[in-house]
Amino acid sequence: MDRRSIIKNAGMAGILAAGAAPALVHAQAAIRWRLSSSFPKALDTLYGSAEVFAKAVKNMSGGKFEISTHAAGEIMPAFGNLDAAQQGSIEIAHTAAYYFFGKDPTFALGCIIPFGLNSRQMTAWMYEGNGMKLMREFYAKYNIINFPCGNTGAQMGGWFRKEIKSIKDLKGLKFRIGGFGGKILEPLGVIPQSIPGGDIYPALEKGTVDGAEWVGPYDDMKLGLNKVAPFYYYPGFWEGGTQCDLMINDKAFNSLTPEYKAIVEAAAAQAHIDMQAKYDAKNPGALKQLVGSGAKLREFPKDVMNESFKSAMKIYDELSNTNENWKRIYADYSKFRADQNLWFRFADAKYDSFMQAQKL
């Protein structure tokens, strides 16, 4: 499926949802699928995108196509749902692909890599560049067809029990971080910890970790991270625009009628837009509340940023020499990133920089 078919099918699904083609809807067999998310219900924006998707599918199909949504741990562990979807134990994994970095670092390119594309650029690469095509070719090896289902936008850099004044303060630091971020920070002395979202608070509270990153103000406040670590750092340079995905078992998806396939595509697109809109609306107020309750905002020191960038580029080059999946997709990704960076430098970056300097 290319981007034109997605647009065409989304239009078809809209017609079905509006009731303009009732014969098509009523002719479909009733279907019941299960979706397992990597996120807890408490995170109503992350987990909520699965609910938005499932509700849209139900509405567009006139109630004939129902998808039950399950939070992390209910029917599958947070990081076990990809395997479950691959094997057909469930139809859909709702997740962030970089959680499966250990299987193949290439998974991260379908989600986010440090110093990678921002949310708009990622959506552009997926829908108007080669991103969707390349990632689907890769996921096919895992019996998966992916659909973007939300983006968090740029994230914060996490909560720390002590200040990070220079790169020296990273040595021996036990830091909860997902995906590729841990790999680029490891050479700088960080000890990465992979912990599901619902377990971050107790780990930080007990001192099992010295710091932890999650998403941004709204979700971090939901988890109460400000109560167990005072220093809130920015930017989250390892997650400049993190995409979530629906990873659908290919046999299950291919068994659908064209009308139901169109509905799935349209519902995923709706959920994709919904997630970032909610984050952009909710994060400003949440940040004010966090600062008002005592959170101490800090910017990462320049040496941390510079050395992290060097570490990332070195690792990307090494992977291009050892991993054929990575080499093929990253070549396209990095070219797209360079072109986007050039354009954004003259448009968004200059505009945003000016506006940030104004008193509004």
Name what the model sees in each region.
Residues 2-19, 24-122, 130-360:
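N-terminal secretory/targeting leader peptides
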